[in-house]
């Protein structure tokens, strides 16, 4: 990289995208301790008494009159469960009992048979993670651990025991009750994991067809969900402001379109301030409680390095979220269209770490740090944002615009479904720093499922040209991309790293922003 101080006079040429380099461990698997090479345990037999309970509420009457007198009436189960049992045959190298949807995903994943045989548990981990509907929140609250002892890995999918709770306080039990959803018709490479519940509503759980009582239980759950949605809408009405946003804001100009809504710029009539307004169609939001959570969190998070929430309105089923507008666009435009020097990268990393230190101090994990979610002001200000509500501002013709929410920035402990905390954001920041160097994250050209496998088994990715980076920058990256979470730097610690002392003034980003805008105009 060049430290050319004349950047303002002549912006550098846009970088040419190169294929991702896959890190090789020379046969050594950093996560071998977590993913045993032995065959997975055999499928445990179902317990007989379960069928007796089913017969009680399924309408069977043979020989049941006497028993009905002896025992109280048993209601249908409130949490019907469709358990998946998957095994692996080390001799044939084939999985047994794998759901058809998973098998299809695996066939198109480009994970080789050798890789599957080498680490079958890692394959199951990433399949379950990729197909899980628990990856649904972007801003998440977390509880600081009282003890250092967390589970070292996820249990095998055919284990009967319950999984130890993660540090993150999200309801992960729900996904254990649902079978893998049907593969969406759109290409997997463009699918957003974080917005999967918005783009592809998860189908109802698949139960045993002969259990009428279970079907009734599912109907009961659906009614309960509908009632909960009504309660959520009522709660939302107590949070938003009263009024018509079309009267308070004028000069609406569409700048983005997403799966469940649209992003506009507009002008505040009273203040003359330009704002960004996200118009969200709540009918396309199956998890409306997440919207309440995000609004409440954003209302509390006021920080110079976070795009500020301004107001919200509810008009019918349309939610309008008003946010601070930054005209410089996303960092993605800069990293894909220009070349950044180390001092400019240091400036961006410092600003993002300041935002993360604030979030983590308030027990919030962002969990989606990437260049797409870093917005720039024309004067060079750097702010974290989250457009997970509905739309992405990046133009649709851009290759990167389809990659929002994909797994390339995820920390290994997230992919392998271990307990995790705020340091997942630090890993993602390290991946974003690689973006600023190379124009893309590692494994971008891989199938998303194989990318997850490589993250889980390879760990720290390798740079394409590490010799071009200064030792101090490489050390910063190593601190961010440390596999051992305990050794990985925190936001507070990394703010003291010598690399950040190299940072140029934020105004040095303005020429890059201008150059990126010009390059994007010429590409249209």
From Swiss-Prot:
* Catalytic activity line of the entry: L-seryl-[protein] + ATP = O-phospho-L-seryl-[protein] + ADP + H(+); L-threonyl-[protein] + ATP = O-phospho-L-threonyl-[protein] + ADP + H(+)
Q: Give the matching Pfam families.
A: PBD (PF00786), Pkinase (PF00069)
Region described as Autoregulatory region: 69-137
Fetch the PROSITE patterns from UniProt. CRIB, PROTEIN_KINASE_ATP, PROTEIN_KINASE_DOM, PROTEIN_KINASE_ST
Q: State the tissue distribution.
A: Ubiquitously expressed. Higher levels seen in skeletal muscle, ovary, thymus and spleen.
Q: What is the effect of changing residue 212 to N?
A: Inhibits caspase-mediated cleavage
Compositional bias per record (Basic and acidic residues), positions renumbered to this chain: 67-81
Q: Which residues carry this modification: N6-acetyllysine?
A: 62, 128
Name the UniProt key words of this record, in alphabetical order: Acetylation, Allosteric enzyme, Apoptosis, ATP-binding, Cytoplasm, Disease variant, Growth regulation, Host-virus interaction, Kinase, Lipoprotein, Membrane, Myristate, Nucleotide-binding, Nucleus, Phosphoprotein, Serine/threonine-protein kinase, Transferase, Ubl conjugation
Q: Where is the composition biased (Acidic residues)?
A: 169-178
User: What general EC class does the enzyme of this chain belong to?
Assistant: transferase
Cellular component, GO annotation: cell-cell junction; cytoplasm; cytosol; focal adhesion; glutamatergic synapse; nuclear speck; nucleoplasm; nucleus
**How does its record describe regulation of its activity?**
Activated by binding small G proteins. Binding of GTP-bound CDC42 or RAC1 to the autoregulatory region releases monomers from the autoinhibited dimer, enables phosphorylation of Thr-402 and allows the kinase domain to adopt an active structure. Following caspase cleavage, autophosphorylated PAK-2p34 is constitutively active.
An example GO BP is:
protein autophosphorylation
Phosphoserine modifications at: 2, 20, 55, 58, 64, 141, 152, 197
Q: Point out residues bearing the modification Phosphothreonine.
A: 60, 134, 143, 154, 169, 402
User: Which sequence positions carry the modification called Phosphotyrosine?
Assistant: 139
Q: Where is the active site?
A: 367
Covalent lipid sites (N-myristoyl glycine): 213
Stretches for region GTPase-binding: 69-112
Linked disorder? Answer: Knobloch syndrome 2: An autosomal dominant form of Knobloch syndrome characterized by high myopia, vitreoretinal degeneration, retinal detachment, occipital encephalocele or scalp lesions, and mild to severe psychomotor delay.
**Which named protein is this?**
Serine/threonine-protein kinase PAK 2
Native organism: Homo sapiens (Human)
Give the classification, highest ranks.
Answer: Eukaryota, Metazoa, Chordata, Craniata, Vertebrata
